[in-house]
Amino acid sequence: MQIPRSIGTHDGSFHADEVTACALLIIFDLVDENKIIRSRDPVVLSKCEYVCDVGGVYSIENKRFDHHQVSYDGSWSSAGMILHYLKEFGYMDCEEYHFLNNTLVHGVDEQDNGRFFSKEGFCSFSDIIKIYNPREEEETNSDADFSCALHFTIDFLCRLRKKFQYDRVCRGIVREAMETEDMCLYFDRPLAWQENFFFLGGEKHPAAFVCFPSCDQWILRGIPPNLDRRMEVRVPFPENWAGLLGKELSKVSGIPGAVFCHKGLFLSVWTNRESCQRALRLTLQDRGII
C-alpha cells in the first residue's frame, strides 16, 4: 500500500537534481517534507507515491522520475522531469515553467548529466548543493544534511517564484510606458523593467533610457541593445561624465543636483527628476540625436 504524499529518492550522497525535485513537489503541496524516504530498496520505494532519481523507471503517469536507465534518452535529470510533470498536470503555466527552467532547472539538468562543468572561480547552484554533503570523516547524519540542502533550495525556489510573479505585475506598467513614451520610459518607482521591456519587443522600440526614483534620488539608466548585451547601451552619456561625482559632475555637465555617473556611461544618478530630464536632453544633444 502506497504512502500518500510521500516521495522516495536514493540515500547516500545527494545532488542538486533530486533535492530540487523534492523541493518543487513540496512547494506545490504534493508531498510532505516528513515523508521523504531516502533508500535504494525497491520494496521501500514501491510504497512511495513519488519516486525520483532512483528506481530505473521514468513514467509520468506512475509518478516515477529516474533518468539513469538506458531506456531513457532525454536530456532531463529528475529535476527537469518533475518540472515538466508540474507543467503537464497544470500546476504551473508555460510561462512559469520556462522561467524556472531557464533560471535554474536546466542548469541542474546539464550539470547532473555531465554536459556542463563549472570553471574555477565560478560556483553553480549544483556546486552549492554538493557542499552540503558530509565529508567522509564526519560522523554526521546524511538525512540531516539533505534536509539543510532541501530547506536552502525551497527558500531559493520560493524567492524565484516571487520574482516571477513580481515581474508579471510590472509587465503591464512597462507596456503602458512603451505605448506612450519614445526616447525615455518614465516610472514612478523602481521596478523590473529590463526583462519585461525586451519580452514586449523592446529590441524594436526607440527608447534609449529609463528614468525612475530610488532612495530619494533619481536614476537615469541607458537601455541596452538587447539582453545579451546588457552592459552596453544604445546611447551612452557624454564621455567627460565618466566616473564623476557630485559637484564635479555638476560642473562638467552644467546640471545642478548631480550625484554620480558610472564610468561605463550607462547609469547616472541625480537628486531630482528635473535634473534627470536635463541630463537626458543634454545627452541626446551630445550624441546628435536631437
UniProtKB/Swiss-Prot annotation:
Xref: InterPro entries: MYG1_exonuclease (IPR003226)
Coiled-coil regions, chain positions: none
Pfam families: MYG1_exonuc (PF03690)
Family listed: Belongs to the MYG1 family.
UniProt xrefs under PANTHER family: METAL DEPENDENT HYDROLASE - RELATED, MYG1 EXONUCLEASE
Protein name: MYG1 protein CPn_0489/CP_0265/CPj0489/CpB0509
Taxonomic path: Bacteria, Pseudomonadati, Chlamydiota, Chlamydiia, Chlamydiales
